[in-house]
Structures are given as C-alpha cells and as structure tokens.
Amino acid sequence: FYWQDFMGDLEYVRQAVRLARKYGPDDVKLFINDYNLESFWDDNKKLKSLIHWIGEWEADGVTHIDGIGTQMHLSCSMDDGTLQNRKKHIEQMFRLMAASGKLVRVSEFDMGMDDASGNAVATADMTEEMHQRMANYYEWIVSTYLKTVPPEQQWGICQWCMTDSPVGSGWRANTPVGVWTGDFYRKHAYAGYVRGLGGKVQTGIETVGQDATRAPKGIYTLGGQKLDRLPAHGVVIVDGKKIVM
C-alpha cells in the first residue's frame, strides 16, 4: 500500500518529518531521495514535481526538509547525440536542485554502457574506446556537480557499485557498473572519477591512454600504488613499462 492513500498527500510526509525530528539526533539531516531526477525523456519533469511537493509539505511553516538526494543509476552512450542530451539534463538537474536551496546529494551513483543502438554492453564486451568514454563521463558528472552546486549545498557523492556486477547479480547483472573490476583492479572509470574530483591519478602513466614514454620515473603496481623497491615476484610498472618479476 501507499502511505499517502491513508494519510493524505501532505500529512504522510509531515508526520514522517515530525517523528524523525522528535526521535532522531538533534543534528539529523532529512532528505527526499528519489531516482530518475535526471530524466532526459521528459525534461526533468519528476524533479520539478518533487521540488513543487517539497514546497507544499513545508507550507505549514513547521515541516523542514534539508536536502534532495538523486539516485543516479546511469548509462553512458556511444551515440554522441544521446550522450549530449543526457548531459544536458544532468546539468539541468543539478541547477534545479541547487536553485531549490536544499542540500544536494548524489545518493546512489553507478554507470553502465549502451552501444550506439541503445543496447546494454556486457562487461566482457567493453572496448578501450568504451572504457575511456565512460571515464570521461564520470569526470564530467563529478566536476559538473562540484561546479554547479554551491559548496555550502554540496552533501557528497555516494558510489553505489564498487565493482562490476557479476553474472547472476540482482543488480545490473554482468555490466561494467563499478570503478574497480570484479578482481578489484582500478578501471578507467576510477581515473575519471578522480579527475572529476580535481585530483591526480597516481599511476605509472600520467592519464588514461597516454603513451608510457611520458610516464614519471618509479616503480608502481598495476593498481597505481608507488613502491619503494621491486617486489620479489609479480607484475609491476617500472618507468612506464610493465615488468614481470
């Protein structure tokens, strides 16, 4: 059943807020958390409706909702037009959320890949071009959040999938939704994430896809950790070249 069917469209949220304020910590932050707020197919209609309803719920002068959480379960696309349209509405989502005056949180963030025809791409079928495109999309989304939402309204980004989803998973099975592989190796997506945050990826190669001759001197693991000395065995990057010990 739906609570609003019994308590009404206004009271079911107001009651939840009252109880949370009464029994929760004094500094509790209350968010309305929902998915498809970046909806490109209806010009962010769901988010616009949600912001309207927050105003209705708060119209009693007592109810206060601190923030809006957006569940960004996205897919990158190999079609340029499709990807640009998705970007347009993600940026519009962040602008609308910021304009609401509420705290803004990316509460569930992961990303699959669609081919140019709109079909989901399995993890094993990802190409180098797809990996790099996805990394760039991660970078763009994270940096757009940081640029569009004022710092005082930023309430963070929560990554939903740490690793790629295995075959048979109940969530986006057999798709490249993680920033690490199933074996916990950093992906191109990890580098894009870090770049979006304004950081530098600490690897033996300066950026994704760059030639190793431009790599800094040193010894690195394949995961990008710098070592003081050569290990007794394994595969490492030495001055930009892979070495088997």
Annotate each language-model stretch with its function:
Residues 25-26, 44, 58-64, 78-86, ...:
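Intrinsically disordered, low-complexity coil segments
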Residues 76-78, 165, 229-235:
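Short amphipathic alpha-helical segments with coiled-coil-like heptad repeat character
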Residues 202-245:
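C-terminal outer-membrane/trafficking sorting elements
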Residues 71, 160, 239:
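Conserved residues at the C-terminal ends of beta-strands
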Residues 23-36, 50-84, 91-119:
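Aromatic- and acid-rich polysaccharide-binding/catalytic face
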Residues 1-6, 85-103, 110-209:
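Aromatic-rich peripheral "rim/lid" segments of glycoside hydrolase catalytic domains that contact
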Residues 1-51, 78-92, 129-130, 168-183:
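Active-site cleft segment of glycoside hydrolase catalytic domains centered on the general acid/base Glu
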Residues 8-23, 49-61, 133-152:
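An active-site-proximal structural segment forming one wall of the substrate-binding cleft
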